[in-house]
Amino acid sequence: MHIRAATMDDMPALMELWTAAGLKFRRGDVPVELAAVLARDPELVLLADNERGLATAVLGTFDGRRGWVNRLATRPGQRGRGHATALLAELERRLAAKGCRKVNLLIEADNKPVTSFYEQNGYSTDQLIFMEKWLPA
């Protein structure tokens, strides 16, 4: 497995991986928004390639105070090989190098396998309520 930073050329493969992994696409999960993330934090959008191609990806961000783990996904059929754990550890290392001291992530409440994965990697649940508001374009 080879971990590397994503480029704009990787966007089609990244979108295909997320689709194959069953991730839901939301309003902000469009190429133009992803390009902005990649321009801002190019070293935090990570891919793990193996002999079969793109296996795992994660979209990391850092707002200067908190790091965020977004859209960590492994291709079905390649799960259980440690790819996601390795990619998460590399993202955490890169966030720490930027001065990040706390990492956050959001999981859909009914996604127990993913909750368990993050708990096994040292994350804990907080009793916060997530709210959002879309602003006019």
Where are these regions (language model features)?
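Extreme N-terminal starter segment of soluble prokaryotic enzymes
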Residues: M1-H2
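Acetyl-CoA-dependent GNAT
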Residues: A5-R71, R75, L88-E90, R94, ...
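A short, acidic/glycine-rich surface segment
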Residues: T56, P113-F117
